[in-house]
Structure formats: C-alpha cells, structure tokens
Amino acid sequence: RGILYHSIGVNGAMYVNYTDEAYIRQLALLKPSLLIISMGTNETFGRRFNTDEFSGQIEAFLALVKKELPNTAILLTTPPECYRRVRSGKQRTYVRNDNTERAARAIRNVAKKEEVACWDLFTTTGGKNSCRKWHSSRLMGRDRIHFTKEGYQEQGTLLFRAFMESYNNR
C-alpha cells in the first residue's frame, strides 16, 4: 500500500494533446486511484484563446477519462497567473497574461459541471496580479511563465495543505 506516484508531462502540452482514446486506455493500465490534471497554461498563449472552445476540450478529455477510468477520482487544477512577452517597438517587455484568469474560471466551471474536484491554484497563489509577487520572490523563472524549483516546491506544499485540510474536514 502507500503512494505510487507517476508523472506524465510534455513541454507545451494542452488538453487536446491528451484527448486520445489510445492514450487514455494506456493510462488506465496504471489503475490510478487519483488522477491530478494540471494543464491550461499553454492554451492561454494562443492568439485567439476562446473559453468556450477551451471548456469543450476539457469536457472531451474528461469524457474519455471517465469512460476508461470510471473508478478513478479526478482533480483538475487551475493554472497560476503568469506573464506573456510582448513587443513594444524594438523592446520586448512582459505583461500579465489575462487569459490565465479566464482559463482558471473555465476550469472551475467545467469541474463543477462534470462533478470532479478542482484545486484553484490561480486563487491560492494570489489571483490577479500575483505573478508580480511570485516573480519578485524568485518563485517564478526567467521566462515569467514557469516556476523555479522553489516555486514548484511551494506549489507542492500548497497542494499538500489543501489535501490535508480537505481530509481533516470530511
């Protein structure tokens, strides 16, 4: 008994990349008790991010997961706020990626609709304008999108606390 941890991740992955029956059938071979899905950031960098389309991609993914893993608990996480790089003349600068807030809201809504758990990392890390604090605290990397090692450790601590709080309140 105990915890068997398995991580699957690909740089730049999006929900649409994992919405594949063959992939989900392979995932089912692991017989997970809990599946934690932490995606959504990459979708927010598209030129025409659309929350309805994004929600549909999550719903399609969840439909496959529920079909192939009917006894597996599912936890969706929302993306934390991040920056995006923009050009201003010859200069490159960073601005808040407003789409992460929209993606977080969409994930929360889909989780409620699909009756799966959701951990709101966007709000937990401070919500709107939190990327400034995470970056100045050196918890966000140079790209201003991904966390540093310390940032990911903090994310893990926050998730652990949320699990324990939920467990203690059952």
Regions found by a protein language model. Name each.
Residues 6, 75, 117-119:
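Hydrophobic/aromatic beta-strand patches that form the interior of the parallel beta-sheet core
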Residues 37, 76-77:
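Structural beta-sheet core signal
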Residues 58-63, 104, 108:
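Generic structural signal for well-ordered alpha-helices
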Residues 1-60, 67-68, 83-85, 99, ...:
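Conserved SGNH/GDSL esterase-like catalytic core that processes O-acyl groups on lipids
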Residues 81-170:
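Catalytic His-Asp segment of secreted/periplasmic serine-dependent ester chemistry enzymes
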Residues 69-73:
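A short helix->loop->beta-strand "cap" motif at the edges of active sites that frequently abuts
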